[in-house]
Design a protein with these regions (language model features):
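Activation/maturation switch segments at domain boundaries
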Residues: 1-142, 225-226, 232, 236-353
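Structured, charged N-terminal subsegments at the starts of enzyme catalytic cores
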Residues: 101-224
Length: 353
């Protein structure tokens, strides 16, 4: 067994963090920026159609906006709402929103402005419902990838392998559903809260724009600007939650492997925060690990990570036996991650929760 120095471990685990960071960046581009951009286009289309239908000279007065829908318009509106309800039931959108839609469908009188607000909120409910589902899947994948890649890097570094327990779907779902911030809110709670805030702001802006008689261009620009803020907020959430669960997976893996201490490893460049610069190179007991205090994420968009810390050869030699054969197994220098996973994970049983 080779005894690696701290620089080796820091380099390897910094590379792991960079790989996870790249995955999160790609996720943000594919599932946040693109999805929000599509939602912006849909909102602009709804607003444009509404203005063109009821306005004169490309602007609508509050008096006109507060007029009730005609019998024909009301029927069309109810058909639209029924479609929303069906979509919500098929895609597990908030039950509270479905209840509001049913109430709207039963109303005898609906104003023009209310009809647009309901259409706008429907797009937000669908958007954020998808965000919750996609982020849940992403965080589960992040946790599993970090857990297995951590075990692989330790095995390669020590040149010995341990048979790993497989992480089943139920365990992964349970892990990412638990709150880790002091306020007790999960990523799902934060997304739905952000949706409520965004919906309130957009509807207030719409009402104020109508009161002022603003033209269509101003209204749609306000929507784009506010949605841009929402994109940034969602991206920060993805980045921070991903960093936490990647680190949590490493902590769990270190504990399983018998690693007693870890080193704080910062990505040192001109974007590194002062707090991460100060923490870089410090090592702590694994049992004392607290994200935000002595482990990543220390802040939003944190790019720091942890690496195993071995004080001597005795520490480095811990937990290097195959769980099935109780024998130490050597990891070939050229063993790839897929080969390692096939041998030491895929053939293993599902471990205890």
């Amino acid at each position: 067994m080779t005894l690696r120095d701290a620089e080796y471990w820091a380099k390897r685990f910094r590379q792991l963090e960079e790989a996870e960071h790249d995955k999160s960046s790609q996720y943000i581009y594919e599932n946040v920026e693109k999805q929000f951009t599509l939602a912006i286009k849909e909102l602009e289309k709804e607003i444009t159609a509404w203005i063109q239908r009821f306005a004169e000279d490309n602007a609508l007065s509050m008096a006109e906006a507060r007029k009730r829908l005609t019998t024909k318009e009301l029927q069309e509106f109810k058909w639209t709402v029924e479609d929303y309800i069906k979509h919500g039931e098929e895609n597990h959108i908030s039950g509270e929103w479905t209840k509001q839609l049913r109430n709207a469908s039963d109303r005898v009188h609906v104003t023009r402005l209310d009809s647009l607000k309901i259409q706008m909120q429907q797009h937000l409910e669908a958007l954020y419902g998808n965000q919750v589902d996609m982020l849940d899947k992403h965080l589960q994948e992040t946790y599993a990838d970090s857990y297995y890649h951590t075990a692989y890097e330790v095995a390669k570094g020590q040149e010995v392998a341990v048979q790993m327990n497989r992480l089943d779907n139920a365990r992964l779902a349970s892990v990412v559903s638990k709150p880790w911030v002091r306020d007790g809110k999960t990523f799902s709670d934060r997304l739905w809260r952000d949706k409520d805030t965004l919906n309130t702001v957009l509807q207030e802006q719409l009402s104020q724009a109508v009161i002022r008689g603003e033209p269509l261009g101003n209204i749609t620009k306000n929507v784009r600007d506010r949605m841009g803020v929402a994109i940034s907020s969602a991206a920060r959430l993805v980045s921070t939650e991903s960093a936490f669960f990647a680190t949590a997976a490493q902590q769990k893996c270190f504990s399983f492997l018998g690693v007693k201490e870890y080193e704080f490893v910062a990505t040192l460049d001109d974007r590194t925060s002062e707090i991460c610069q100060d923490m870089d190179g410090k090592h702590f007991k694994l049992t004392d690990m607290k994200p935000g205090t002595n482990a990543p994420p220390m802040h939003c968009n944190c790019r720091s990570c942890i690496a195993p810390y071995f004080d001597d050869a005795k520490d480095s030699a811990r937990a290097a036996r195959n769980l099935e054969t109780s024998k130490t197994e050597t990891v070939p220098a050229d063993m790839t991650y897929p080969e390692w996973k096939q041998k030491y994970v895929e053939k293993a049983s599902t471990g205890p929760k």
